[in-house]
């Protein structure tokens, strides 16, 4: 396959960054050419306004990194070395109902829930924590096998989705925590990095950068 054919094939499949290698033969000599290129989304992203509906009290000392509603209960992950924690919060009053301090060697980041578990990321420590949702008992830990850092995290019924500070969104097996594949978060003219906390709703992932949403599918470049 030559570079032009490979590029056309990539464009037909998806957006993102691609690395294509081509081998050239001249007699007994073999030459290898590597070419990296980017494919952007076809359309500009939509820009939304918002309306502030209500405000709630919140601990001003909490260095919030992740938020997760389960029914009417708010779970929160706070960061900073020495003050990281996992919390259960009454969002109406701001009262912390349950708090698990994290070892000072970890800076905790995004959280999500999957079935009866809470999953919490660390920033640069290459480890994630799995807790019992009701008791906050630590059930398991896991390593990031491909991504360099832990930033945002969310889930649907089948997978976890994670960001790492780059423009990549990782799809993760919730049983093994293997990073299965990634998609690049792309607009019509830019790759969006530093995408942080995530929430999944109605088939879309809402991501905190300003605030954007993207399809979890690596082949859907329309969102």
What is the predicted role of each segment?
Residues 10-16:
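Surface-exposed, short loops/turns at beta-strand junctions within beta-sandwich domains
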Residues 34-49, 82-87:
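Blade/loop signatures of beta-propeller domains
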Residues 76-80, 120-126, 162-166, 207-211:
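Conserved beta-strand positions in repeat-built beta-propeller and related beta-rich domains
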Residues 90-93, 132-135, 174-176:
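Short loop/turn segments that connect beta-strands within beta-propeller blades
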Residues 96-123, 127-128, 138-144:
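Blade-loop segments of beta-propeller domains
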Residues 42-59, 94:
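A short helix->beta-strand "capping" segment at the edge of beta-propeller domains
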Residues 60-70, 104-114, 145-157, 189-203:
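Beta-rich, blade/repeat-based domains predominating
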Residues 213-220:
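Conserved small/polar residues in nucleotide/adenosyl-binding loops
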């Amino acid at each position: 396959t030559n570079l032009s054919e490979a590029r056309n094939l990539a464009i037909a499949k998806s957006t993102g960054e691609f690395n294509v290698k081509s081998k050239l033969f001249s007699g007994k000599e073999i030459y290898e050419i590597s070419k990296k290129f980017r494919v952007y989304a076809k359309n500009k992203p939509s820009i939304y306004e918002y309306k502030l509906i209500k405000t709630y009290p919140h601990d001003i000392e909490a260095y919030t990194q992740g938020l997760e509603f389960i029914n009417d209960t708010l779970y929160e992950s706070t960061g900073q070395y020495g003050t990281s924690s996992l919390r259960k919060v009454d969002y109406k009053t701001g009262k912390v109902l349950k708090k698990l301090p994290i070892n000072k060697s970890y800076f905790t980041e995004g959280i999500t829930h999957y079935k009866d578990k809470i999953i919490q990321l660390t920033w640069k420590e290459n480890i994630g924590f799995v807790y019992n949702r009701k008791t906050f008992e630590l059930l398991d830990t896991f390593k990031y096998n491909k991504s360099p850092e832990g930033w945002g995290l969310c889930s649907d019924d089948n997978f976890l989705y994670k960001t790492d500070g780059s423009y990549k969104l990782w799809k993760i097996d919730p049983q093994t925590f293997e990073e299965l594949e990634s998609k690049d978060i792309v607009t019509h003219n830019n790759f969006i990095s530093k995408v942080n906390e995530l929430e999944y709703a109605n088939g879309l992932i809402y991501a905190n950068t300003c605030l954007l949403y993207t399809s979890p599918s690596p082949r859907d470049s329309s969102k």
